[in-house]
Amino acid sequence: MYKITQLSIFLENKRGNLYNTLDLLAANDINIRALSLADTTEFGILRLVVPDYKKAKEVLESKHYIVKETPVIGAVMDDIPGGIASILKILNDEDIDLEYLYAIAYGGTEKAGLLLHTGDLDELESVLLKHNIPLVPAEIIYNS
């Protein structure tokens, strides 16, 4: 219910690669709800959350992109200074080791969303709910 499928796309560090990838998705009417790009010397990892991840994966793989599906959890927080830190404090106090996180647009201007990934998503979900942190239902992502 709360696990959101993220696509990780491996991109060669080459001029125009990011544009070409995002243009391909746009040309196939695929909207991007969240995006993160991490790079190394030779390649980057583009992480995306889209409403129709199966279609996006199919489109990308048809053009020989390497695409991996990974579940993430979306947490909702107040859009104020310290919003992210308050969630990270809970995770730190509960000994949850995050692998990565990035932002997602959520709830207009008063709320913000944070996509989180860790080795044990069930534990992450349980801890967040125990501390009354609202989670982003996957249906909101997929039905938009």
Regions from the language model: what does each represent?
Residues 1-144:
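A conserved regulatory-domain signal marking ACT and ACT-like small-molecule sensing domains
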